[in-house]
Amino acid sequence: MQSEHIRERINQFDNKLYLEFGGKLFDDYHASRVLPGFAPDSKLRMLMQLADQAEIVIAISADAIEKNKVRGDLGITYDSDVLRLIDEFRGKGLYVGSVVITQFSGQHSAAMFKKRLENLGIKVYILYYIPGYPGNIPLIVSDEGYGKNDYIETTRPLVVVTAPGPGSGKMATCLSQLYHEHKRGVNAGYAKFETFPIWNLPLKHPVNLAYEAATADLNDINMIDPFHLEAYGKTTVNYNRDVEIFPVLNAIFEQIFGQSPYKSPTDMGVNMAGNCIIDDEVCREASRQEIIRRYYQAVDGIADGSRSEEEAFKIELLMKQEHITSTDRSTVSPALVRAETTGAPAAAMELPNGKVITGKTGDLLGACAALLLNALKELAGIDHDKHIIAPTAIEPIQILKTKYLGSKNPRLHTDEILIALSATAAESEDAKLALAQLPQLHGCQVHSSVMLSEVDRKTFQRLGCDVTCEPKFQ
């Protein structure tokens, strides 16, 4: 359905469409959480259906290169992510035509990155900084504005413009290309693919509220598209930045083409996700859970200094709109109760069958390591009181940690308990059976009564568990 809709949009123009691709093409876990059944790579697979028609242009701003901007979810710089994306796309059989460096005003590191890409055989184009952008339309749509930018040579009908993250200049790249194509007599088109907010769901639908929670740091606000309402008398949802920029876009389209092909920001979109929802209540509940997860991310961020209080306040307001609290997350109360009764950190996990398992801090294991072991035993049908890892397998790791590696904490972390379990599995059928349950942990919900160590957080992430923590340091 989605790929066919994009083909229709290509045909509306001179067989040339510049598609601004928002959000994540790979590993879109937010979408998969709030839309159960939506695979994290759904957008990529959709694009692969258009592989013979599509080429990819990756945009990165010169400022992001200069400031070593980091992609939060992966912990790598934007310029490193450009190289990663190129490899990922090519590995999937998609054609990467070029990289465009936007907002360039002579930044040395951006020039060095351009040279590095060219040495790798990658075509690189430059879009220059335009004073007064995006308001100074007479300058922007002139030989001194878009006209100064490089014309990106493309060979296929669909040009997908993507980027490592927001603020990379994707829209500016598309509009600059429209200007240059028009100068060359080609009536190219522009469209936008954004999964969220979903335009044909109600404004206050939990799926759309979960998007607001996810972008609370950007101050994105969902709103009724006033231009669409005026043009068609129909209520649709868009977000504030697209609504605010639309008059400017419209004026740019009119300057280039004589008239705008679109009457509203919603018209520009090609997203069909809203038409694919078959169980609304499941999506509503999944989105409520996502809002709670985002709340915990925000308050944990306040504790470690990476987030603002305003972000948490905004998500709290969304929770009040949905009449939910943090304890509506099934693992929160069990983790807190276990921590209170033991007087030490504890954690809880909801298994695929809905049962909640807890883990406490002990002499040998940290709370998360104990939780992991308890969950695997439960899934394997092994009695809770049965030891499946001999103390003789744990003690050498403790000695290594404390005596040789200088650690003050002798308790095993999640990665270490998995290593001990793996070593034991060579001789123990129970350990082997427990280890085989690891794939079942994917998608399980975890809550900790304290903030996790980096190693525990990364282990749960690799296992595919969704983790939240109380904003308390151990």
Segments the model singles out, each with a brief description of its role:
Residues 383-395, 399-409:
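Substrate-recognition/cap regions that form aromatic- and gly/pro-loop-enriched pockets
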Residues 364-380:
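A short, polar/charged loop-to-alpha-helix boundary motif
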Residues 189, 361-362:
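Residue-level structural signal for beta-strand termini and adjacent loop
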Residues 184-188, 381-387:
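Phosphate-handling active-site elements
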Residues 173:
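Hydrophobic positions on the alpha1 helix immediately C-terminal to the Walker A/P-loop
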